[in-house]
Amino acid sequence: MLRFGANLGPGMLFSEYPFLERFDHAAAAGFGAVEYPQPYGEDIRAIRAALQRTGLRQAQFNLPWGDIPGQRGTTNDPSRRAAFRDDVARALEIAAELECPRLLCHAGVALPEIPFDVQWNTIVDNLHYAAEQAVPAGVRILVEPLNPFDVPGYLLTTTAQALRLLDEVGHPNTALLYDIYHAQRAEGNLTATLRAHLHRIDHIELADSPDRHQPGTGEINFRFLLGELQTASFAGWVCPEYRPLGSTEESLTWLREWTTRE
């Protein structure tokens, strides 16, 4: 049976409610976990209380993205190595407080003044450091490709690039976050990719393409893809990360149909 979690990030599921109230609505809708990108400006004790109150799990959250809008991480910046290590420590402290077993480390947006190979090697070194630091905490480090239309300049846009990065990092405490929406926009070939690489995927996010709304509003056959994941006994969380058309509750028809089918 697939496990579904709700993305409570800005503009995503249950955004019509204040942040901490979204946990209650997610639990009432049948989700077993939540995720959101950046908890750093929130009251962590209040989040922990919301998780305990609702019985939800914290599936994952991101390492800090940095101070520049659109930055998507400092992992590629050789001048920010010390700051990156501080960010890892901070994220691991919060992960311990929230009993969160995964942290997502974005690769960053290209820095035009720095050669690509320098940025790439910085990412490799930083990811290895993060993965090693996370071992004692029982936290796995994830990487995620993002499509170049939504995030221009982002350094990982395909599954192949992300897997190459993980191979070069060479640490067993790393895995791939596969976002079905970003993958469809960037490269397509969803089914073949899942079949070939599901053993390296620890977490899945989804939205329909091309407009990032709920399943059934675009070009992706989610009934088929979810069936593939079910057949393969995928054990990670599957988290819708979309902008609902209508209310969030109205947008969850696809989930109710799937759970009834199960």
Residue positions per predicted region:
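Glycine-rich, proline-tolerant flexible connector loops at the mouths of alpha/beta enzymes
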Residues: 35-54, 62, 107-115, 150, ...
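Conserved beta-strand positions in the central sheet of alpha/beta enzyme cores
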Residues: 35, 59-62, 104, 142, ...
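Alpha-helical segments flanking ligand/cofactor-binding loops in enzyme cores
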Residues: 24, 48-49, 93, 132, ...
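N-terminal small/glycine-rich loop or linker at the start of catalytic domains
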Residues: 1-11, 60-75, 107-111, 146
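Histidine-acidic metal/acid-base catalytic patches
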Residues: 1-30, 40, 99-101, 156-178, ...
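Active-site acidic/histidine proton-transfer and metal-coordination neighborhood
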Residues: 74-175
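Anion (oxyanion) recognition and catalysis
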Residues: 27, 52, 96, 131, ...
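Generic structural signal for helix capping and beta-alpha/helix-loop junctions
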Residues: 43, 68, 112, 144, ...
